């Protein structure tokens, strides 16, 4: 990540002064910077201040260069699906950035489950007489009526029966009240999908939240559209966070738009009069000194845990919405390995994308061949397994690669599990550098609830009478995805600030 921006500098504030701005934006992640960027294009003369609690921008986008000029180590948000993520695609186009397709779910990749080595293709091939499929049927005791159908086809057909309109427009899944108010697993059971096949689906997805986390059915359908591998995944050339840096460079060259890093918000006192100014108390996190900001409106681009720390008259509906979200934990470890190790794990370069297992090392990616890099990725209970190996001092800083000796127990356990999955002697796995991070709340997902109603009401967390707004992927129809963050910000700017949607703008060209 760049330590400074190429065309502008970060401003500092004299805490003895009370600043007055038109718009205060809290949060330097994708939705916060997007909001400032789009406002600067429509209202260059407005005075806008963006604050970010950390010493760097990007929010849950953390891209680290490791020698590959195209693909970075994506410690947070990792990939985009252009046919689904329309807002991300539009931003990439407008910034003149590039994205490239990267292998994801390849049929010959390893699937190590129940102490048995299969290929990922085992869930899709048929008929049941196929040796790979026979193993899968025996391991998971798949019922006869589901044995000759691919797991993805069973899951897709069940979703179509529950939400007939979703193949034409996946956003319509949220129009079905029953899908918002029941779990993904309950929906499958109602549609006749066995618990055995549901288990196969979750295990082979490489994730551990579809069934075990009790997601709302509508949310589960949406997530599977991306995660299923039916659509091509792309990585942003130069790192996913480069979209934030690109928007930043274009925004803060304008002296009316200011950016304060190392600045958190502690309190919001809304104005009692319709045209009055809201008062926000900020704190310089380096000095502890308070800063008072008065603004006509506030855009909060913050996740659930950050919103909960702000002292403000938050409405009961907002509290209800926040309580309806469940946290999603994640763990990633990027290993820079020698060429021999990479050849072993990638099966001499034949394996691309990721293999899966039911071990805590749920996903193992042949991430980069030059330089050789392997990624271990897992979530929720499996991520929690790795938490005991985490050094909090390292985990809480912007990630970087370290000598493996810095955490020998972690490296040893990673090598042990990789060895089991790929039938490789752990002593032959050579790790030269390691980068790792445990995300306590990498995203938030909806539990069964009245999702559309709650998401609409939470847009104005202090009530509709106040010009204080909330954006971010947590309250979007694409939870956990950058596109969700941009979608909420774009909708807000259109509705309350008269900014043209970037999607409509793209249609003009």
Curated annotation (Swiss-Prot):
GO terms for cellular component: virion component. The keyword Metal-binding does not apply. It is found in: Virion. The keyword Protein biosynthesis does not apply. Its main location: virion. GO terms for molecular function: oxidoreductase activity. It comes from the Viruses. Keywords: Virion. This is Uncharacterized protein R188.
């Amino acid at each position: 990540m760049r330590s400074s921006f190429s065309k502008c500098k970060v401003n500092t504030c004299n805490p003895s002064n009370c600043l007055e701005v038109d718009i205060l934006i809290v949060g330097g992640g994708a939705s916060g910077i997007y909001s400032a960027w789009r406002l600067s294009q429509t209202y260059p003369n407005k005075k806008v201040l963006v604050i970010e609690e950390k010493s760097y921008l990007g929010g849950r986008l953390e891209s680290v260069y490791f020698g590959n000029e195209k693909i970075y180590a994506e410690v947070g948000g990792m990939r985009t699906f252009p046919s689904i993520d329309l807002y991300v695609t539009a931003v990439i186009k407008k910034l003149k950035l590039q994205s490239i397709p990267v292998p994801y779910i390849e049929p010959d990749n390893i699937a190590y489950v129940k102490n048995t080595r299969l290929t990922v293709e085992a869930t899709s091939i048929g008929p049941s007489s196929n040796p790979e499929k026979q193993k899968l049927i025996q391991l998971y005791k798949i019922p006869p009526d589901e044995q000759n159908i691919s797991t993805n086809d069973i899951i897709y057909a069940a979703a179509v029966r529950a939400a007939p309109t979703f193949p034409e427009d996946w956003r319509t899944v949220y129009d079905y009240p029953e899908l918002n108010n029941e779990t993904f697993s309950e929906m499958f059971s109602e549609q006749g999908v066995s618990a055995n096949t549901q288990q196969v689906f979750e295990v082979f997805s490489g994730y551990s939240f579809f069934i075990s986390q009790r997601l709302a059915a509508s949310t589960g359908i949406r997530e599977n559209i991306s995660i299923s591998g039916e659509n091509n995944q792309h990585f942003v050339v130069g790192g996913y966070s480069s979209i934030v840096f690109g928007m930043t460079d274009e925004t803060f060259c304008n002296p009316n738009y200011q950016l304060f890093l190392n600045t958190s918000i502690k309190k919001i006192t809304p104005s009692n009069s319709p045209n009055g100014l809201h008062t926000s108390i900020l704190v310089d996190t380096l000095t502890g000194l308070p800063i008072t900001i008065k603004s006509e409106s506030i855009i909060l681009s913050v996740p659930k845990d950050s919103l909960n720390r702000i002292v403000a008259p938050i409405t009961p509906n907002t509290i209800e919405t926040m309580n309806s979200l469940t946290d999603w934990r994640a763990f990633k470890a990027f290993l820079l390995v020698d060429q021999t190790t990479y050849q072993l794990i990638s099966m001499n370069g034949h394996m691309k994308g990721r293999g899966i297992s039911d071990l805590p090392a749920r996903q193992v990616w042949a991430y980069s061949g030059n330089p050789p890099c392997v990624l271990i990725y897992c979530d929720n209970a499996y991520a929690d397994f790795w938490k005991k190996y985490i050094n909090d001092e390292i985990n809480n800083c912007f990630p970087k690669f370290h000598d493996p000796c810095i955490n020998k127990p972690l490296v040893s356990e990673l090598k042990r599990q990789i060895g089991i999955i790929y039938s490789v002697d752990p002593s032959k796995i050579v790790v030269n550098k390691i980068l790792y991070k445990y995300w306590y709340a990498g995203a938030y997902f909806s539990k069964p609830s009245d999702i559309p109603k709650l998401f609409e009401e939470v847009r104005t967390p202090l009530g509709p009478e106040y010009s204080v707004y909330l954006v971010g992927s947590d309250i979007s129809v694409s939870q956990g995805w950058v596109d969700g963050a941009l979608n909420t910000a774009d909708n807000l700017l259109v509705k309350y600030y008269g900014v043209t949607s970037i999607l409509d703008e793209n249609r003009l060209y």
